[in-house]
Structure formats: C-alpha cells, structure tokens
Amino acid sequence: MKIFTIVSPGSRVVCRRGGIYVVKGDSKEKILIPPDIDCVVVASSRVSISSKAIRVAARRGIDFVFLDFNGMPIARLYPPYINKTVAVRVSQYMLFQGDYGRKLAKEIVYTKIVNQVELVRYLAKNYREPSLREVAYQIDSIATELRALDPKILDRDILMSFESRAAKAYWQTIASLLPDSLGFRGRDHESRDLFNMALNYGYGILYSVCERSLLFAGLDPYLGVLHTPKSGKPSLTLDFVEMFRAIAVDKPLVINVKKIKLAIQQDRLDTDSRKSVASIVLENLRQRYLYIKTSKREELSEIIKRDAWDLAYCIREGLEYRGARLVI
C-alpha cells in the first residue's frame, strides 16, 4: 500500500492537466501525487482540496484520510465501489456475537502479545541487553497462559487482564530504553509527554492503513469483538490495529528516537515533529517482515492488506482465523 502524507499547513491539493498536485502555501512549488498512490493522509487542519482533485482521485481508487492533531482519523473520503459484496458483512454480523467472536478476540490479544515479545527480543539483540531476553520470556509466558485457556470461559475483562499484564512489562522495557528528557513513564494516550504524543500520531497513520484494508476486504470496521461496539467507534479497526502496533509504530519510533527532534507547540506536536514521525512510520510500512502465514518476507503495508483479506475470508467461510504473527 502506497501512502502520500500532507503535513504542511496552508497546502492546496489541485488538479492540473490530469495530475493531482500539492502546492505548498504561497509558493509556486508543486509536488505531484503519484497516480499509483493508494491513500492520501491529510495531517494538517489548514489544507484545501479542490473538488476536481477529489473526482480524479476517486476514479483512480485513491482515498483521503483526515487526521486530528493527535493523529486520529476523523474523516475519510473513498470511492463508492470499494467492495460491493455483502456476504462478508452478513457473516460478520451473524458470527461476532457467539463463540466465533470470543475465539477471534482471544486470537487478536494473543497475537498482539506475541508481536510485543518479538519486538523485545529484537531490542535485546539490537541494544545488546541480556536482561531484555528475560522480559521477553516473561511476556511470552503470559501469551502461553492465554493460549491454553478455553475461549468459552473468556470475556472481555479476562482478555484485558492478560493484555494489561503484558503491557506493563512491555512498556516498562520501552521506557528504560528512551532518553529521560522525553519524560516517558509508560503508555498513556492522554499523556502530554513527547513520546506518548509521537505514539498517538504514529498509531493514527496505522489506523488509516488498517481501516482501508478492512473496507476493501468487505468488512464493517464498526463491528468488532474486543473493543466495545459504540456508535461512531470503528471497533473492528481498533481490534485489527492491536496486532500491528508493536512492529508498525513502536519499533521504528524507539530505534529512531535519537535521530528525531520532538517538540510541542500549543499542546501538540509541532509541524516538523509530525513530519518526522510520519516519515519514520511510513518508511517502516515499506520495510519487509516475515509473515508467518506465508513464510515469506513482504512489505508491512502489504501484510496488513493481505491479513484483512484473510480475516474476511475466514469470517465468510466460518473458519478459524490465525493472527498476523510477524518476525523482524
């Protein structure tokens, strides 16, 4: 999946001679949005888009995602022909309320924890910290314990308790590797420290990629199994994202944290910080990882897309779904 990000305030998206361009502020500089782009992420509140540019983008299958200052998607423009089949959604509505939904929720949490283990092992090797291997073992034991439980006795509270136990050890490890100047003490999406804000912004980009993949696979992003369904809340998108957070966002931000200068302006990341975070996360989405299901190394964005289709297929056929386990 190819993504183009617009961060600069005052940018205009226009159509010229069949091409879609971004014009930055008052300058005459025009940047062509390549025609093979899948998604344009608009990450500034002061960007204008012409209706002609929207029409041309729609014909090319390009959608626009708008992020708020925290990086959360708040709106999306996409072509009306994404996926016209209703079979997947009918199965989704029928299966998610019973045993299938509980099994799927368990698999999502299990996969999230396993991918956290993979990142901690990678960091242990990268930072040459033997103590991190012990942390990886502790988190892996939580995943093993969860794996052994009968899904029929699981509810959301039990699953969240496993996720919380793993997260405590995981985020303590991440915090120990970061400079004290960032003020990061653990994951809190409401915290105003620099690294939590960078994580929020990176996750916002990941949300937009995952939601697009689910929509194109024919799934309803608003009916999930782990996050409580609520009007206007993309519960399935939030569920699906959980499996990819560690590898897609946490990894690139942790290993590049000393290369980027994060700064706050008016209680939010400034423009340069958002550009840096977006660049790092998007570059990582183009990196190849071993996708356990296929035993092949593929671009992370393609793995996300492929896994959404696999989830849709399993739901449509009533088959057991296996999460997106990755190897760095």
Please tell me what each predicted stretch does.
Residues 1-16, 22-25, 32, 59, ...:
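Active-site helix-to-loop segments that bind/position phosphate- or nucleotide-bearing substrates
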Residues 34-48:
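Extracellular/luminal Protease-associated
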Residues 40-43, 62-68:
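Short hydrophobic alpha-helical runs that function as membrane-insertion/retention elements
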Residues 45, 69-72, 219:
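An acidic- and aromatic-residue-enriched active-site/binding cleft used to recognize and process polar
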Residues 27-28, 36, 58-61, 65:
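An N-terminal structural lobe/cap that precedes and organizes the functional/catalytic core
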Residues 52-56:
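A short acidic, amphipathic alpha-helical/loop segment
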Residues 50, 70-76:
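Short gly/pro/ser/thr-enriched loop/turn and capping motifs at secondary-structure boundaries
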